[in-house]
Structures are given as structure tokens and as C-alpha cells.
């Protein structure tokens, strides 16, 4: 049994071809933060005939099962990434949609300190920082970031 088959079974999901193919694409580093529409286009490009409705349904199932994490970045478009064991935060370009993951212990420590000052014990958090690429011409290069 492959690792992907085990992952699906451990999540309580039946092993189906669409689920396996979508999981394979999500494991590609170039598809780290991907929308349902972009995932659908990638599947078409590699010759997989999986409908857009199926892609949405599988991503929702994966989200419910904890296999993927859904992010609703500025602009209203959901993007998905495989759920990771390590915590990280995100920088997002408002022009091209580029997503950069980062970890910074100073930020994490400050968040815990602020929560403690207010009598809150943190269990989870999300930090999204929005801005614009310094190059200034990233809109022209939008396709380079659409599959991240």
C-alpha cells in the first residue's frame, strides 16, 4: 500500500483515483499554495480528466479530514496547501498573488507574550502579511505565482 493510500485511509477517506491524483499534484512543490481552479488546470495539463466540481469536493473533503489547510487570502480566493507539521506564517503580494512562507521565533514569542498579558493561552493562530513585490512589475509575471 502506498503512502498516499495510507494517508487517505487514515483520514477515513476511500481511496479513489481523483483523490490520489489530486494528492499527488498537491505534493509537487510548485503547487504549494493552489486554488481549486489552478489545480483543475494542472490536472487537465497532465491528462487527468477530473471535473472541476470533483476537485472542489475532494479539496473540501481533504480540508475536513485535515489533509490540506485552506487559506482565504485577501481577494477572496481560497488556496490550499498540504497540512504541515511545522507552523509557518505567510507573506502575500496583493498584485500577483505570490505567497512566501516564513517562520520567525521572535514573532511567535511576542504573540505568546501578548496573549499571556491578556489572559489568553494560545492554541493556534494565523498570520498573513500583505504587501507588494518590490520589483514593481510582478503583475506581468502573475503566471509565475499562480501555481504556488
UniProtKB/Swiss-Prot annotation:
The keyword Transport does not apply. Signal peptide: none annotated. Residues 85-142 are annotated as: Dimerization. It holds the Pfam family FUR. Keywords: Cytoplasm, DNA-binding, Iron, Metal-binding, Repressor, Transcription, Transcription regulation, Zinc. InterPro entries: FUR, Fur_C, WH-like_DNA-bd_sf, WH_DNA-bd_sf. Homodimer. Fur acts as a repressor, employing Fe(2+) as a cofactor to bind the operator of the iron transport operon. This is Ferric uptake regulation protein. It comes from Yersinia pestis.
Amino acid at each position: 500500500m502506498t503512502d498516499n493510500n495510507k494517508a487517505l485511509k487514515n483520514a477515513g477517506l476511500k481511496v479513489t483515483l481523483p483523490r490520489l491524483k489530486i494528492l499527488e499534484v498537491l505534493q509537487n512543490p510548485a503547487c504549494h499554495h493552489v486554488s481549486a481552479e489552478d489545480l483543475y488546470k494542472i490536472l487537465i495539463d497532465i491528462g487527468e480528466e477530473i471535473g472541476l466540481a470533483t476537485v472542489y469536493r475532494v479539496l473540501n473533503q481533504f480540508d475536513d479530514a485535515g489533509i490540506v489547510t485552506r487559506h482565504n487570502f485577501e481577494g477572496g480566493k481560497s488556496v490550499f496547501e498540504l497540512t504541515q507539521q511545522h507552523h509557518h506564517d505567510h507573506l502575500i503580494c496583493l498584485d500577483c498573488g505570490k505567497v512566501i512562507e516564513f517562520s520567525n521565533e521572535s514573532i511567535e514569542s511576542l504573540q505568546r507574550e501578548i496573549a499571556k498579558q491578556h489572559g489568553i493561552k494560545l492554541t493556534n493562530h494565523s498570520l498573513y502579511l500583505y504587501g507588494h513585490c518590490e520589483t514593481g512589475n510582478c503583475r506581468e509575471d502573475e503566471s509565475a505565482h499562480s501555481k504556488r
